[in-house]
């Protein structure tokens, strides 16, 4: 007998394209005349592509974002002598570095960090325009603005890393370079410089909310998949009539841990855990160097960590190795 399994999407319903709700008179038209469907996307979610509403904010966001990506990309290409083969071979190690400490908050020459400043400006404008677009689209649809404010939490962390903290520290060299491995190297050097971020309480909270959000998402996703044979994935119907799917899902968690979330509260829990991850992370980064110079010594002072004897020679301050040389 075949067993019902739905870890991967098995069934696609091919129906007529949905054009969306009517737009207000003052809005620009949607992009794309006729939506189309892609079977592979239907295995992950809705197979329909379009129509897309860009509007002036969306178009400007894409323009500024494209300029930022081009500046970063061409600088990386220039760093390998305009060799496309080396560009792809070394891509994960290439970077566009911030200015060196000697420039402080001044405008440096383009090749000494000026390109980094320009790319960061364009990227920030692009992200903020996209946020405004998300907010206005939610309002136009009569929705709440929960998605926009969740995105704002991520923007907060981005601005702390690349703008707010460098300004408070008085140097653009404190910011993160553009690049995959280089930004990871920056993170490791940052932790070493400020005495191990593991002793930063806001870093600990950020990781707790990160793992918590992952756990909640896994619990919620697994529960809905487990009762989808009873129609549990049709949440609109379940709100009006809990039916056997929601009853079984809630009964399962009451049986296993003595408590169950509701169809609404699980989403509120997940939203808060996900939002608090970058919010706490941004606070922890912002306090490093501005308020606390060494998180390990801070932890020793407050009885969080033991005091270890000095065995090895002091390491070189990573701050002296950052920025464009």
From Swiss-Prot:
A molecular function GO annotation: metal ion binding
Binding site for a ubiquinone: 253
UniProt GO cellular component terms: plasma membrane; plasma membrane light-harvesting complex
Principal location listed in the UniProt entry: membrane
Key words, A-Z: Bacteriochlorophyll, Cell inner membrane, Cell membrane, Chlorophyll, Chromophore, Electron transport, Iron, Magnesium, Membrane, Metal-binding, Photosynthesis, Reaction center, Transmembrane, Transmembrane helix, Transport
Gene3D superfamilies noted in UniProt: Photosystem II protein D1-like
Domain of life: Bacteria
PROSITE patterns per the UniProt record, alphabetical: REACTION_CENTER
SUPFAM superfamilies linked to this entry: Bacterial photosystem II reaction centre, L and M subunits
Pfam families: Photo_RC (PF00124)
Subcellular location(s) per record: Cell inner membrane
Signal peptide: none
GO terms classed as biological process: photosynthetic electron transport in photosystem II
Subunit structure: Reaction center is composed of four bacteriochlorophylls, two bacteriopheophytins, two ubiquinones, one iron, and three highly hydrophobic polypeptide chains (designated L, M, and H).
Function: The reaction center is a membrane-bound complex that mediates the initial photochemical event in the electron transfer process of photosynthesis.
Protein name stated in the entry: Reaction center protein M chain
Recorded name of the encoding gene: pufM
């Amino acid at each position: 007998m075949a067993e019902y399994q739905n870890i991967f999407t098995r069934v696609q319903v091919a129906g007529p394209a949905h054009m969306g709700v009517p737009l207000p008179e003052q809005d620009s038209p949607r992009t794309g005349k006729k939506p189309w469907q892609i079977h592979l996307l239907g295995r992950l979610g809705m197979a329909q592509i379009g129509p897309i509403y860009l509007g002036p904010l969306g178009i400007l966001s894409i323009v500024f974002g494209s300029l930022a990506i081009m500046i970063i990309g061409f600088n990386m290409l220039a760093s390998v002598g305009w060799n496309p083969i080396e560009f792809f071979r070394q891509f994960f190690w290439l970077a566009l570095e911030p200015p060196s400490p000697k420039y402080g908050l001044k405008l440096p020459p383009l090749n000494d960090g000026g390109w980094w400043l320009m790319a960061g400006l364009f990227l920030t404008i692009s992200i903020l325009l996209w946020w405004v677009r998300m907010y206005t689209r939610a309002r136009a649809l009569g929705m709440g603005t929960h998605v926009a404010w969740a995105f704002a939490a991520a923007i907060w962390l981005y601005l702390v890393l690349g703008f707010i903290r460098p300004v408070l520290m008085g140097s653009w060299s404190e910011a993160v370079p553009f690049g995959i491995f280089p930004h990871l190297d920056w993170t490791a050097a940052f932790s070493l410089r400020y005495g191990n971020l593991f002793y930063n309480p806001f870093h600990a909270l950020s990781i707790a909310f990160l793992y918590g959000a992952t756990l909640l998402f896994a619990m919620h996703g697994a529960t809905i998949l487990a009762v989808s044979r009873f129609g549990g994935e049709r949440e609109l119907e379940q709100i009006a009539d809990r039916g056997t799917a929601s009853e079984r899902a809630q009964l399962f968690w009451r049986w296993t841990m003595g408590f169950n979330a509701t169809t609404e509260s699980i989403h509120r829990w997940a939203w808060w855990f996900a939002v608090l991850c970058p919010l706490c992370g941004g606070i922890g980064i912002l306090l490093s160097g501005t308020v606390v110079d060494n998180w390990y010594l801070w932890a020793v002072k407050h009885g969080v960590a033991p005091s270890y004897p000095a065995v090895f020679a002091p390491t070189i301050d990573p701050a002296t190795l950052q920025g464009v040389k």
